[in-house]
Amino acid sequence: MKFFKPFLLIAILLINQCVLAQSYTPPVDFSMLLSGTFGELRSNHFHAGIDIKTEGVEGQKIRAIANGYVSRIKVSSWGYGKVIYLTHPETGHTSVYAHLKAFSDRIDYLVKKEHYKKESF
């Protein structure tokens, strides 16, 4: 009985982890080679994501890693550049797609519309 409670606790925790495990699909159709890793030390900060190499080709198609909705779109001349944030309600996570060369036509239309509305480019 002395070992039963700790064993039961560990078993419950392991089962819980298996039930809550997330399965995401890769955001690209080619082999994922990383050029930057999460937590990597940079000159003045820790890297907060992963950077996927694009086989030297700009404009590769990417896709969402899981079901969700676009919760934020941003365009900046520094930092992430063109970036899309997807919220995944089933998990409570947000995935960030940064350093994009271009948006889809639909998102690009919405971005331009908002820029003209705010007269901010």
List each model region and its residues:
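Surface-exposed, glycine-biased beta-strand/turn segments
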Residues: 19-94, 101-106, 114-121
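Sec-dependent N-terminal signal peptides
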Residues: 4-15
